[in-house]
């Protein structure tokens, strides 16, 4: 029905498209703009994550620790694609191709909070993405750092949540992931048979 008629009644809105179980609800606490603690509920997986800097991180009462992977070639990474990927040439396609050929594999889950939680749990070795909002990042960033991982922006600088560009790893892979990101240039849209609208 039209939006005007929907406003007249109660609605339930959910974000579990197609029954895909990788969705989450996350809450982060910031201190002076920096994530201090985070809690992430993943009902589709029956998992609850929480962590606090200096105290540690857990999933369903099991302690979390980032992976011990040392070499990018042995790593399993995760990324995502921003909502405006069809409108920008800086759309992460080049980075996805680059790392797909230089790692054990790259996954795309779709929930930034869970991607970060999986890095904190050592299931994934690293994560990068652009186009994120502070509410996408706050809880997961706290988890990764509480579990012994490293967080920064694409330039290796301390993360400012407002930039929307994050790199998260177990620590050992941080220089390798940053080096790869620096080497990537946007792919010409013709290589993936698309047209990007002209704009800034």
Report each predicted region and the residues it spans.
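DPxDG-like acidic metal-binding loop motif
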Residues: 10, 14-58
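Single conserved hydrophobic/aromatic residue that forms the stacking wall/gate
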Residues: 1-13
């Amino acid at each position: 029905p039209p939006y005007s008629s929907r406003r007249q009644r109660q609605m339930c809105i959910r974000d579990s498209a197609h029954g895909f179980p990788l969705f989450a609800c996350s809450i982060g606490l910031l201190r002076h703009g920096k994530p201090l603690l985070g809690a992430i509920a993943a009902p589709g997986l029956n998992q609850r994550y929480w962590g606090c800097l200096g105290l540690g991180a857990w999933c369903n009462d099991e302690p979390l620790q980032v992976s011990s992977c040392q070499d990018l070639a042995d790593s399993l990474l995760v990324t995502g694609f921003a909502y405006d990927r069809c409108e920008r040439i800086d759309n992460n396609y080049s980075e996805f191709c680059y790392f797909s050929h230089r790692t054990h594999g790259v996954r795309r889950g779709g929930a930034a909070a869970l991607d970060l939680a999986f890095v904190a749990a050592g299931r994934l070795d690293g994560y990068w993405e652009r186009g994120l909002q502070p509410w996408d990042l706050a809880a997961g960033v706290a988890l990764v750092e509480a579990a012994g991982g490293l967080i920064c922006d694409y330039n290796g600088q301390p993360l400012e949540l407002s930039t929307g560009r994050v790199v998260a790893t177990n620590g050992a892979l941080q220089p390798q992931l940053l080096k790869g990101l620096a080497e990537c240039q946007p792919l010409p849209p013709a290589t993936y048979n698309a047209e990007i609208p002209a704009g800034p």
